[in-house]
Amino acid sequence: MVIGIIGESCTGKSTLADKLKILLNAESYAGKDYLRLAKSETIAKKIFQKKLDEATYGLHIIYVISEKEYLQLLPKQAIRVLVTAELDTIKERFAKRMHGNLPAPVASMLERKHGCFDSEIHDIHVKSGQSDLDEVCISIQNIISRKTGQMPCIED
């Protein structure tokens, strides 16, 4: 099953992906990670698209998306998890990534992009700081079970 974890930077997508990767024994990709599949971007994208299409009812693949252009790679049957956070939270986390300094142009960019995924179709909405990730993982497992008719592969 393909699980698309969608949202702006610094909303908690990677934290959720890391937890799911272990729980589901899944492969995980983010953004243009698929480029490691081939030397040519065009070929790598085709290989990745095929891999996602084949994983719809087999191996679990988590795809972390923070740019809208990559949404088109998700198969129709993928589980879509929208992860959001308050703008102040995003700015605070982004500043930590930049060693405590958030330049004004970066803050402006975050403000412009804030909410850009909010209208995207999703199966689950995770609100950073409000949603319990263990409960989110259980919900995702339940969706996998419903869509595939079988229990997901869970690591002990």
What spans do the regions from the language model cover?
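Walker A/P-loop
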Residues: 14
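Conserved substrate/cofactor phosphate-moiety recognition/catalytic segment
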Residues: 17-58
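Hydrophobic anchor at the beta1->P-loop junction of P-loop NTPases
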Residues: 5
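Small-molecule kinase domains that catalyze NTP-dependent phosphoryl transfer to phosphate-bearing small molecules
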Residues: 99-156
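P-loop (Walker A) phosphate-binding loop of NTP-binding proteins
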Residues: 8
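ATP-binding Walker
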Residues: 11
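Conserved phosphate-donor/acceptor-positioning beta-strand/loop module used by diverse small-molecule
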Residues: 74-94
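Walker A (P-loop) ATP-phosphate-binding motif of ABC ATPase nucleotide-binding domains
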Residues: 2
